[in-house]
């Protein structure tokens, strides 16, 4: 009798202890990021690749899968250089999966690089001004451009050293590329000062 009772109790207890389904947290929709946020998404992997990795260029990537505004972009491409390795490497961060760009952070193949060339790295500390502030400064100094009626392309961003200015600059431009831009403005990435067109 005791064995039968214990068997019945064991069966009843085991049937009561089934795991209830756990509610999953809702998936957060992808969000565009600022230039500085995009840079800091790629930096840990670049630093793992080369301890002395320094950025040479930060570039926004516009994507139809996720529209962005206010100085943000759906994806960012950051070029790094390592003087110790004599190599450069491009990392991308993307909020979404799209043709040619993977979601998350991905690295390209290493390429040869030497100091003193056209692509000059800059210290991370020079990235004090983020893209929303650079965009605001660019708009304030683009009254002539915005007086012209008609639709304007979405603004894009490139941060790099140029021969024109002593500090790295955010180039805020309206157009498909830097070379075909309708309008572009340079903003100092360390001070936020307007530098010119």
What annotation goes with each model-predicted range?
Residues 1-14:
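Sec-dependent bacterial lipoprotein signal peptides
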Residues 16-197:
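Long, terminal "pre-/pro-" and other extracytoplasmic accessory regions
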């Amino acid at each position: 009798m005791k064995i039968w009772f214990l068997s019945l109790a064991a069966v009843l207890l085991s049937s009561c202890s089934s795991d209830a389904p756990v509610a999953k947290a809702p998936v957060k929709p992808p969000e565009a990021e600022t230039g500085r946020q995009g840079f800091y998404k790629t930096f840990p992997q670049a630093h793992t690749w080369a301890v002395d990795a320094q950025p040479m260029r930060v570039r926004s990537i516009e994507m139809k899968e996720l529209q962005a505004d206010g100085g943000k972009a759906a994806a960012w491409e950051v070029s790094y250089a390592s003087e110790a390795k004599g190599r450069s490497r491009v990392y991308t961060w993307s909020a979404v999966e799209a043709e040619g760009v993977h979601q998350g952070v991905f690295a390209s193949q290493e390429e040869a690089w030497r100091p003193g060339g056209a692509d000059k790295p800059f210290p991370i500390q020079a990235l004090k001004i983020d893209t929303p502030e650079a965009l605001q400064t660019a708009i304030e100094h683009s009254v002539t451009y915005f007086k012209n009626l008609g639709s304007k392309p979405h603004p894009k961003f490139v941060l790099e050293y140029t021969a024109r200015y002593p500090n790295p600059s955010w180039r805020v431009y309206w157009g498909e590329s830097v070379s075909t831009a309708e309008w572009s403005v340079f903003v100092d990435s360390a001070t936020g000062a307007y530098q010119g067109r």
